[in-house]
UniProtKB/Swiss-Prot annotation:
Signal peptide: none annotated. Pfam families: ADH_N (PF08240), ADH_zinc_N (PF00107). Zn(2+) 2 binds at residues 98, 101, 104, 112. NAD(+) binds at residues 178-184, 202, 207, 269-271, 341. Belongs to the zinc-containing alcohol dehydrogenase family. One of its GO terms (cellular component) is fungal biofilm matrix. Its EC number is 1.1.1.1. SMART domains: PKS_ER. This is Alcohol dehydrogenase 2. InterPro entries: ADH-like_C, ADH-like_N, ADH_Zn_CS, GroES-like_sf, NAD(P)-bd_dom_sf, PKS_ER. The gene is ADH2. It comes from Candida albicans (strain SC5314 / ATCC MYA-2876).
Amino acid sequence: MSVPTTQKAVIFETNGGKLEYKDIPVPKPKANELLINVKYSGVCHTDLHAWKGDWPLATKLPLVGGHEGAGVVVALGENVKGWKVGDYAGVKWLNGSCLNCEYCQSGAEPNCAEADLSGYTHDGSFQQYATADAVQAARIPAGTDLANVAPILCAGVTVYKALKTAELEAGQWVAISGAAGGLGSLAVQYAKAMGYRVLAIDGGEDKGEFVKSLGAETFIDFTKEKDVVEAVKKATNGGPHGVINVSVSERAIGQSTEYVRTLGKVVLVGLPAGAKISTPVFDAVIKTIQIKGSYVGNRKDTAEAVDFFTRGLIKCPIKIVGLSELPEVYKLMEEGKILGRYVLDNDK
């Protein structure tokens, strides 16, 4: 398969600096890597943080962001096995890990101290050709709609892992805070597919209609409710058994520790810059609640999340725009005006 020497990409030289849509060299895969012709790439809040540089983890510079890339393998490093040119593959957040530490050996590769992160420490999917470690690259079944599967590679895997972390049983209530966004809209669907009752929390009537169309049983509009905590408790007859916090609101996270049911689990996913969680110790002990962080999933979680999608149980509410329009997508993201997930067509 013919591979060009240059490609279109969006790159920045400094954190918060100009996002340049321009020609850059096509990378050459290392011995353990795939070269993937990225057809589509989802846009995640993490990409916005990587550009701004407002997380306590330094990015490489200059940097090509993006970590939800779906495409076709066009070249293989000499040590790669189990892949062939023409396979569908995904660039996900975890680009590679050491595979030798205690975390990698126990299936917690995302927690590896030497983890290489797409669109953060490794040039990501906001380019037409990207490299990915052959062990960690996502396997996508042939014939899959690449535009629609792209958000599954991070957003889908992330919320699916969070729901597993909540350790709920079928028929129990789960509250999803930030339910209409890119992560939340997928969390609602995965929760429904896993047999849970879904209470969605977000702001605006249009968002209520949207999340109910995805499977939410109840919607709480935080812009209209005077007491969100009591409203959630009332709607779920005592509070949800689990909460998935994909919201980037520190206040919403705090409220979740108040309305979660006794013996319930609060799972933290969204990463508001500089945020802290605060809850009365007395209440946490008496209610015996658990507060858990949930990062991205491992290879098994990825395969399972993709399987839900390929079986038609998850629909990605996406809007496709050109790669060159990434700065406008970031602006909408900062203004909180995004329903579902924006996906970039890397050929535009």
